[in-house]
Regions:
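Short acidic, Gly/Ser-rich segments with clustered Asp/Glu that frequently serve as metal-coordination loops
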Residues: 158-164
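Conserved beta-strand elements of the Class I
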Residues: 152, 370, 545-547
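Thiamine diphosphate
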Residues: 1-150, 297-508, 516, 641, ...
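Terminal amphipathic helices with adjacent charged low-complexity linkers/tails
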Residues: 58, 240-333
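Residue-level marker for buried hydrophobic side chains located in beta-strands
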Residues: 153-154, 182, 372, 486, ...
Length: 652
């Protein structure tokens, strides 16, 4: 670093980050000291952001996939002019602060997504880059490029070791996400020690084999070399990885070792760091020249870029008024839907086929709906419209995710984070295990991502226990802010899908059946929106309540009718969404599940655990499934009417 002001800025980021971590007595100084020059170069020479209009639509997106480097992100965002004060920096990792331990979306200005679980940032960045590429192709006309921005990622060795990163890198290369630029903080150290103890890949050959552009910067403090590499990446027609060799904990006594990764430096080491860097400022003191430099090279440059874009958008409005109006509709999700186009299924059908048909109709009417399946389109019946999104065909809204469930979940999140599009992904329910961290991320970030899973019980049948979900409802229903919906027929499918598509701040999971299900007399699309409602009422004094969902609801109703023949009268409640039901007024919940009726039996072909919240008794499945034709499943597991009738009669 030859430029004195650049050197001062980089060292300011380093010391702000170190002092934040010291004050909190918690954090990760290694990446702050090693990567400060990388993030400084990106912000001051390339990143187009408007700190005065943080949601400017055509801004570049920057994802700190290595979320443990949050102190560095907060420090530079403070310098850049975001609403992050010195007091906020001093409150790093403290109760109710605006600077939490890992970056949190919508909690701190300048944070594009919640990161921390390694690999999630890279994969979601693929979704952002895909969204940019699709929308640019859809809207840009006559050199009026109203969608024209880059997605940048800063990652470390740990990110690239995650399986989700491998999936995402492969996907990005295949779909040629050329405006995705990954800055790889390659310091050869991770928490356990040297990276070569766990990893011996040839990064260059690996990325080039997956259709990425690769560059190496040998000195992570060489701002000019980093700048040149980013310039080259922006010209590339492929996604780009820039491997930047850094020294973890640069400037301090433990630099270059794993000792510096995740613990505060302390007073003595910080003093040595200041001496080594020639940095004489007091803790949390920032030279006015640094603020001035960032104001000129980040804030002012970003405002100018925004102004140019706004002028371009006005010209676009004048020349292409219809397309402009469509653009506004995309950005605001302002599309109307004609529900009369949704077919009825009076004779029943599998809910996977019904949902697939309904999703097709939504896609026909909502041009911003995009998504696909993890190599399971013929089985899930879930696909996007207008053909396949490919490197050489950007009009398609069907994303062929391949057998990459984890990346699919994060890519869906990234598309939804980007804005302008509403994304969904689908697979077999049993393989929601592979997606759980991405689904959890969606719930934390309050993203309206849509995850659709077919084959939701042991009625998968012949494929056996590896393909038959048991604990999966319990797993997903236990995630806060996740709406897990399990419809029983076309009327409930209609409600569940509409709720998911119109959700604003809650991700949705919809599970569907492999087998055909009957259409039930008293199911109701409106009532289903409450999460639970009465579908069969006892003709006389209620002895108890059966609660069920999905494919077992019809069996529960038939069981109630069988009990009635023996003068035992029960109510049947459909509960497609415990999440929605829990959010209703107490008066409504009492009307469906009166507290005076304690004899309640929940019936679902999955783990029994979640249902004890609503029922004293549960008929579930707490063993793994079996390989057999579906005709054997109900009797074997006790979900036929005769077995359920006897089960209820034996309740005390």
């Amino acid at each position: 670093m030859e430029n004195n002001i650049d050197n001062l800025c980089v060292n300011t980021i380093r010391l702000l980050g170190v002092e934040m971590i010291n004050k909190a007595n918690s954090g990760h100084p290694g990446i702050v000291l090693g990567s400060a020059a990388i993030i400084h170069t990106l912000y001051t020479r390339h990143l187009n952001i408007n700190v005065k209009e943080v949601d400017w639509w055509n801004r570049d997106r920057f994802i700190l996939s290595a979320g443990h480097g949050s102190a560095m992100l907060y420090a530079i965002n403070h310098l850049a002019g975001y609403d992050i004060t010195i007091e906020d920096l001093k409150s790093f990792r403290q109760y109710q602060s605006r600077t939490p331990g890992h970056p949190e979306y919508k909690h701190t200005e300048g944070v594009e997504m919640t990161t921390g679980p390694l690999g999630q940032g890279i994969a979601s960045a693929c979704g952002m880059a895909l969204a940019e590429k699709y929308l640019a192709n859809h809207f840009n006309k006559d050199n009026l490029n109203i969608v024209d921005h880059y997605t940048y990622v800063l990652c470390g060795d740990g990110d690239l070791q995650e399986g989700i990163a491998q999936e995402a890198i492969s996907f990005a290369g295949h779909t040629n996400l050329s405006k995705l630029i990954v800055l790889y903080d390659s310091n050869d150290i991770q928490l356990d020690g040297e990276v070569n103890l766990a990893n011996s890949e040839n990064t260059k050959l690996k990325f080039e084999s997956m259709s990425w552009d690769y560059q190496l910067v040998k000195d992570g403090n060489d701002i000019e070399a980093i700048d040149k590499a980013i310039c080259n990446a922006k010209k590339s027609n492929k996604p780009s990885l820039i491997e930047i060799k850094t020294i973890i904990g640069y400037g301090c006594p433990d630099s270059g070792t794993n000792l510096i990764h995740g613990k505060p430096l302390g007073e003595a080491n910080t003093k040595a760091l200041r001496e080594n860097l020639g940095y004489d400022y007091a803790p949390f003191e920032v030279d006015s020249e640094v603020y001035d430099f960032y104001k000129e090279n980040v804030e002012k440059r970003g405002i100018e870029a925004n102004t140019v874009w706004s002028n371009k958008l006005r010209e676009y409005h004048t020349k292409f008024s219809d397309k402009y109006n469509e653009f506004v509709n995309f950005m605001t999700y302002s599309f109307k839907f004609d529900y009369s186009k949704l077919k009825e299924y009076p004779n029943g059908e599998s809910t996977r086929k019904i949902l697939g048909a309904y999703l097709d109709e939504y896609s026909n009417q909502l041009p911003n709906l995009i998504g696909g399946s993890a190599d399971l389109t013929p089985s899930t019946f879930v696909k996007g419209a207008d053909g396949n999104f490919e490197a050489d065909f950007l009009n398609g809204r069907n994303i062929r995710f391949g057998v990459r469930e984890h990346a699919m979940g994060a890519i869906v999140n990234g598309i939804n984070l980007h804005g302008g599009l509403k994304a969904f992904g689908a697979g077999f329910f049993v393989f929601s295990d592979y997606m759980k961290p991405a689904i959890r991320q969606a719930a934390i970030m309050k993203l309206p991502s849509i995850f659709i899973f077919s084959h939701d019980t042991v009625c998968v049948g012949e494929d056996g226990p590896t393909h038959e979900p048991i604990e999966h409802f319990a797993m997903l229903r236990s995630i806060p802010n996740l709406n897990v919906m399990r419809p029983a027929d076309y009327k409930e499918v209609r409600a569940c899908l509409d709720i998911a598509i119109n959700s604003i701040s809650t991700p949705s999971v919809i599970t569907t059946s492999r087998q055909a299900l009957p259409t039930l007399e008293h199911t109701d699309s409106t009532a289903a929106r409450f999460g639970a409602y009465v579908v069969y009422e006892a003709s006389k004094n209620i002895d108890g309540i059966l609660i069920s969902s999905g494919s077992e609801l019809s069996i529960a109703i038939d069981t109630a009718k069988a009990l009635e023949k023996e003068n035992i009268f029960v109510r049947v409640v459909s509960m497609p969404s415990p999440y929605l039901f829990d959010n209703q007024e107490e008066e409504y919940k009492e009307s469906v599940l009166p507290s005076s009726i304690t004899k309640r039996l929940a019936i679902e072909m999955g783990a029994s655990l979640p249902w004890y919240k609503y029922a004293k008794y549960v008929k579930g499945i707490d063993t793994f499934g079996i390989s057999a034709p579906i005709s054997y499943m109900h009797k074997h597991f006790g979900f036929d009417v005769e077995s359920l009738t006897e089960f209820y009669k034996n309740l005390k």
